[in-house]
C-alpha cells in the first residue's frame, strides 16, 4: 500500500498531468481533492493528446478508480461533455466516483464570475470565469448545492429557487442584468440526474476502505501552491486550498494516511493571469520559453507569462507542503539557451531576502537576485539517466536541489510518457 500526493509547486501548469499519469499507471485509486474545471492538464498517449479538466487522470487506466472528492466543485454539464469525449476515445468512464459532498457549479455561478471579473476593470484577478469562486463562496456561506442534493428532486428545487431569489436581486440591483429563469435551470439539471445517480458515492468511506485494504492511492492536486487561497499570492489566487494539507481534508481521510508528498515544478516558471511575478521575462527569453514550451493554457488558451525559476518561492512551496521530493518537468525546453539563471534572493530596499516574504507588497517592489549558469545545446529528449545529461544541465539540477534541500527524483525531458529520467 502507498498513498501519494502530487501537487504543483508553482502557479500551476507545471506538468502535473504527466507526473500524475506516471503514478496513476500503478494506482488503484486517483483522487482529485480540490478545484473544478478551472484547471487543465494534457496527457500525451502516443499520437493522441488527451486534455482533462475535471475527470481524474486515473480514468485512462481500466484497473484504476477515479474519484472526484468532497473538496471539488463540479460543473455537471462540463463533466458530461468530458465523459462523452473520453467515451468517444474508447475510454471507459463507468468506474468514476463523485463524492456526495462535492459542491455543484450552477449556471448563476458562472454568470456572476464573469460579471464580477468585468466590474474589476484594471484590477481583475484573471479568473477563468468558470464559476469556481462564486461556487466556493456559496459553500462557505452555507447555501451551496451539493451533488447529493440532486438525488432528491424536491429538495433540489427548493434550494435552487431560494438561491435564485438572492442571485436575481444581485443581478438586477448591482449589475443591471436581466433576472434568471429558475425553471430553465431546473429543466437543464433534470437531464443531469442520471450522471449523478450512476456515479455518486460516499467518497470518504470508499477511500478509507481502500486504505484499510492496502490499496495504492494517488491524490491529484490542481493549480499550484502559489495559487493557494491562504498561502498563495493573494488576492491573485484560486478559491481553494491547493497545498498538501487539503489532500486529506478534500478527500475525507486523516493526514496520517499520507505517505509521500511530491511537488512538481518546471525547470523555469510560468503564470497565467494577473499578479506579481519577480522573474518574469518580457523579452526574447520569455518568448523562447513560451514558444518552445508551448505555454498556452489548456482551459483558457491564454499565453502564459514565463520567466527564470524562482528558488525562493520554490523553497517556500517545499515548506508549506512538507514535500518529500521534487519532480522537474520541461528541462528539455531550456536546451538551446546560452545562459540560464536561478533566482536565489529578493533585493528589497538594499536588503537581500532569502525567505519568501510574508508581506505581499515586497513581491511588487523587490528585484530578483540571480545566480547564472552556462546552458547547453544538446537534444536531451532521449536521455534516460542523470549521468548522461550534459554537464551544464547536471550542474543546473544540482544547484536547485542544494537550495531547496529536498531530493529531485524525476526529470521530464519531453512530453511523451517515456521521456523521463528516474533518479
Predicted regions and their residues:
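Non-transmembrane, aqueous-exposed alpha-helical and coiled segments at domain scale
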Residues: 1-423
Amino acid at each position: 500500500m502507498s498513498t501519494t500526493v502530487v501537487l504543483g509547486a508553482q502557479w500551476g501548469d507545471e506538468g502535473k498531468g504527466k507526473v500524475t499519469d506516471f503514478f496513476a499507471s500503478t494506482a488503484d485509486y486517483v483522487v482529485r481533492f480540490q478545484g473544478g474545471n478551472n484547471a487543465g492538464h494534457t496527457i500525451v498517449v502516443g499520437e493522441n493528446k488527451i486534455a482533462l479538466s475535471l475527470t481524474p487522470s486515473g480514468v485512462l487506466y481500466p484497473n484504476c478508480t477515479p474519484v472526484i472528492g468532497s473538496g471539488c466543485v463540479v460543473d455537471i454539464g462540463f463533466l458530461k461533455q468530458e465523459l462523452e469525449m473520453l467515451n468517444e476515445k474508447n475510454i471507459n468512464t463507468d468506474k468514476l466516483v463523485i463524492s456526495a459532498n462535492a459542491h455543484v457549479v450552477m449556471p448563476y455561478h458562472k454568470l456572476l464570475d464573469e460579471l464580477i471579473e468585468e466590474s474589476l476593470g484594471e484590477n481583475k484577478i484573471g479568473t477563468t470565469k468558470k464559476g469556481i469562486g462564486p461556487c466556493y463562496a456559496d459553500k462557505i456561506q452555507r447555501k451551496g448545492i451539493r451533488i447529493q442534493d440532486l438525488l432528491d428532486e424536491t429538495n433540489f428545487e427548493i434550494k435552487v429557487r431560494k438561491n435564485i431569489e438572492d442571485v436575481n436581486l444581485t443581478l438586477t440591483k448591482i449589475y443591471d442584468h436581466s433576472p434568471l429563469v429558475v425553471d430553465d435551470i431546473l429543466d437543464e439539471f433534470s437531464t443531469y440526474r442520471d450522471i449523478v445517480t450512476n456515479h455518486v458515492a460516499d467518497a470518504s468511506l470508499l477511500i478509507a476502505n481502500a486504505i484499510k485494504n492496502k490499496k495504492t492511492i494517488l491524490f491529484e492536486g490542481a493549480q499550484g501552491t502559489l495559487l493557494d487561497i491562504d498561502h498563495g499570492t493573494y488576492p491573485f489566487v484560486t478559491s481553494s486550498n491547493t497545498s498538501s494539507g487539503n489532500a486529506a481534508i478534500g478527500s475525507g481521510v486523516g493526514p496520517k494516511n499520507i505517505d509521500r508528498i511530491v511537488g512538481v515544478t518546471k525547470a523555469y516558471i510560468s503564470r497565467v493571469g494577473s499578479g506579481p511575478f519577480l522573474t518574469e521575462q518580457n523579452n526574447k527569453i520569455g518568448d523562447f520559453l513560451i514558444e518552445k514550451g508551448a505555454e498556452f493554457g489548456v482551459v483558457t488558451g491564454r499565453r502564459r507569462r514565463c520567466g527564470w525559476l524562482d528558488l525562493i518561492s520554490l523553497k517556500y512551496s517545499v515548506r508549506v507542503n512538507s514535500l518529500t521530493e521534487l519532480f522537474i518537468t520541461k528541462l528539455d525546453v531550456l536546451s538551446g539557451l546560452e545562459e540560464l539563471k536561478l533566482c536565489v534572493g529578493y533585493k528589497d530596499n538594499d536588503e537581500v531576502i532569502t525567505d519568501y516574504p510574508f508581506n505581499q507588497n515586497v513581491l511588487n517592489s523587490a528585484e530578483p537576485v540571480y545566480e547564472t549558469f552556462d546552458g547547453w545545446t544538446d537534444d536531451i529528449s532521449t536521455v534516460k539517466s542523470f549521468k548522461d545529461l550534459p554537464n551544464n544541465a547536471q550542474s543546473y539540477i544540482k544547484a536547485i536541489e542544494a537550495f531547496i534541500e529536498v531530493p529531485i527524483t524525476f526529470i521530464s525531458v519531453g512530453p511523451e510518457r517515456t521521456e523521463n529520467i528516474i533518479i
